[in-house]
Amino acid sequence: MNDKLCWPDGRRIAVMLSFDFQGGEDVRPDRNGKINHEEWTQAEYGPQTGIWRILRILEETGVNATFLTCGGIAERYPEQVKAIVQNGHEVAGHGYHHEVARDLTLEQEREVIEKTTAMIEKRAGKRPIGWRSCTQSPNSLELLMEHGYLWNSNSFSFDLPFLWEHKDSTLVELPRQPFGDGRAYGHHDSGNPNDALVIWKGLFDDFYEESRLGPAFCPFQFHPFISSRPGRARALKEIIQYMRKHDGVWFARGSEVAELTLKLGANFPRKPALKEAVAS
């Protein structure tokens, strides 16, 4: 634990609720060039229907969240992005069409970041400063620094935030835990909401117990097209309500955690953002 770290108002644990806001971008044509209608409409449930249930749950529980949003979603669903902002949540980047970053060339990935940044700024009225891509390439960190991003969220290697450094640039990493709804529910139509709730409570409980020794960071990764379905939405609401019953919990947006991490940078690990280091 890091005994030099201090969350606002002496709170002992920062909970980051993040939602990867995507739609049919993940549904690729088959070898005949045809789209699977069932898979497409399942994915589109998120931006067309589920997002409104998610926003309602967040409002009812009184917590803030971060929406990692595909540029294509922002382009096609401007009112949904506007509602996210109006409800006090953060909009960050998640690729344009949920591209697999490791499969992109340097120039292709640069174009995705630039296009996504511009579209989110157009729809949200504010430039995004956080990013999470579908996988990560050896070029990702340097490209995010090049484009002025504050934070990234793709690593699973630490519990607490840490700093990537390259030349005169610094990028905050907000690490993830591999227990999101995508794994709990198999992304589409499997999994038990009660089992997911047990997993998420266990994640929080362990971090909360450890926070007696020093402030902790507890990230959650959800998807509107997964966790907004009836039954699953109840599990989402229940885990938030469960955490809210504990003292000293800070429900923070990604930028809030990242800004404080940067401010207290001397107390956090620093790693070189080298292509060789990332690839290894």
Model-predicted regions and their roles:
Residues 161, 173-195:
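Positively charged, amphipathic and often flexible ligand-engagement surfaces
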Residues 1-174, 197-220, 226-280:
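Catalytic alpha-helical scaffold of carbohydrate-active enzymes acting on polysaccharides/glycoconjugates
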